[in-house]
Amino acid sequence: MPWALPFLFLFGVLIVAGCQPDRDPLPEGFDIQGHRGAMGLKPENTLPGFFKAVDLGVTTIEFDLAVSKEHKMVISHEPWFRADICLQPDGSPIPRDLERSFRLYEMSFETIEQFDCGSLQHPSHPDQQTLFAIKPLMSEAIEMIDDYARSQGVPPIGYNIEIKSDPAWDGSLTPEPAVFARLLHEELLALEKRLETPLLDRITVQSFDPRPLHALRAIAPTIPIAILTYTEGTVDDHLRFFGLEPEIYSPNYGLVTAEQVQRAHELGMRVIPWTVNRKADMQRMVEYGVDGLITDYPDRFNELFPRP
């Protein structure tokens, strides 16, 4: 029956279309966080990376903090200059066996900003664009990101700030945790006053180390806290380890289960796993019901979940 072929074709198209998943299953308020900016595409924890993250529509920029000799907040994943991604002020390489002697806590920011941490190809991100870039001050970075977002007609960006802290670093690579938390809080307050715009309500502070989180909670109880975990265990196990009730539970994505997400939600926490870079894992996290995710590749997330 040749006359029936067009109807059969149309019926088949409708069936296939009806079986397609929703193109945007994301719940309202889903938080796309650019890990160290957009680390897969631009040098980590640098202004070019932060601007790229804004261009890609992240709702939050995640970055790490170290402290300079004069107690300024410097954006850096390590409290030293890594030999594989940074060059000395004269352009010479940093000896790998001596990299931990290049301590930010023993340098003024005037010295820190002379190091190039963007021109070397990142060993784990071969597609990352290389360009001259420095470790910026937190205050200057937030102000410039806010200005850039405003110029692009983008809603105010959130900031997820990781305090890099370890008992072995206390007093040598970083300040004592209570001092670190106080310095961060004071700088955020001063920055909010200078910008004359709400800032603290866009801040989250996270750490793998419970100590600075406890110190911050004591002096700034309204700032949301995220606990970072990379070990196996239940949500309750991790809460016992940290000894506080955070607003956000942030485990390594490889350890996340639907049951964990459900339990965290029962306890009133949002779940934002790290660092989710493969599309299949992004899809799985969304299916588990997470409230956001941290990724080096916001562009991949956009391809998977197109947004207006």
Question: What is each model feature region?
Answer:
Residues 18-308:
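Phosphate-group recognition and catalysis centered on beta-loop-alpha active-site segments
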Residues 6-15:
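Bacterial N-terminal signal peptides
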